[in-house]
Amino acid sequence: MNIILFGPPGAGKGTQAKKLVDFYGIPQISTGDILRANVREGTELGLAAKAYMDKGELVPDNVLIGIIKNRLNEEDCKKGFILDGYPRTVPQADALETILDEIDKPIDVVLNLEVPDEVLVERISGRLMCKCGASYHTIANPPKKDNICDICGGEVYQRDDDKAEAVQNRLDVYKKQTQPLINYYEEKGILVTLDGTKDINVVFEDIKAVLAKFA
């Protein structure tokens, strides 16, 4: 089963990807992870990517798609894969389709986790962090004492990019970027939109039901 997973920040995409990996035994392919791995290992494409990254520039699509193609050709992808964070644009989706045709691994289904903005803003802007690594949520998992970490007694804080205004900006960027891709895969008849506001386990049961139809 070859899957693309879409979902805005805070929709629970990472949680569902992990559940898919555990249940189906197929790898989650994160473009950020494989890019860093190629740079670290000094592969030809990794060195090409590093030249752009060192200048603070975006890695061009032709380099990125080469890295993805190599990753999808690895042994652990034989039974399927979950693509997370790619494609981000319609030209990338076209390039992906070309390489998947070449290696005979077409996308079976595109899962789109949908959650209203106000719910996402509440989920993300409620996050609190501590320098010791502990994390809290003002509603779902608040510290026992206001603004004090249960574990180390340090002060908990909100990251700047988790503040409501910053979250809304991130969501606006995501929608602007992703909507053309939603339309793209909808036209191909492989897009399934799921309600991401439900309980984590219920969402996963919904995903399994969808995948059973596409298997």
Curated annotation (Swiss-Prot):
Protein residues bound to ATP: 10-15, 127, 135-136, 198
PROSITE patterns assigned: ADENYLATE_KINASE
Catalytic activity line of the entry: AMP + ATP = 2 ADP
GO biological process terms held by the UniProt record: AMP salvage
Residues where AMP binds: 31, 36, 57-59, 85-88, 92, 159, 170
Subcellular location(s) of the protein: Cytoplasm
One GO MF term: adenylate kinase activity
Any single Pfam family the record assigns to this protein: ADK_lid
Gene3D superfamilies: P-loop containing nucleotide triphosphate hydrolases
Record-listed E.C. numbers: 2.7.4.3
Record key words, sorted: ATP-binding, Cytoplasm, Kinase, Metal-binding, Nucleotide biosynthesis, Nucleotide-binding, Transferase, Zinc
ATP-binding among keywords: yes
Chain positions covered by the region annotation LID: 126-162
Pathway(s) served: Purine metabolism; AMP biosynthesis via salvage pathway; AMP from ADP: step 1/1
InterPro entries (UniProt xref): Adenyl_kin_sub, Adenylat/UMP-CMP_kin, Adenylat_kinase_CS, Adenylate_kinase_lid-dom, P-loop_NTPase
GO cellular component entries: cytoplasm
Family: Belongs to the adenylate kinase family.
Subunit record text: Monomer.
Domain remark text: Consists of three domains, a large central CORE domain and two small peripheral domains, NMPbind and LID, which undergo movements during catalysis. The LID domain closes over the site of phosphoryl transfer upon ATP binding. Assembling and dissambling the active center during each catalytic cycle provides an effective means to prevent ATP hydrolysis. Some bacteria have evolved a zinc-coordinating structure that stabilizes the LID domain.
Protein name per Swiss-Prot or TrEMBL: Adenylate kinase
UniProt organism field: Methanosarcina mazei (strain ATCC BAA-159 / DSM 3647 / Goe1 / Go1 / JCM 11833 / OCM 88) (Methanosarcina frisia)
Gene designation: adk
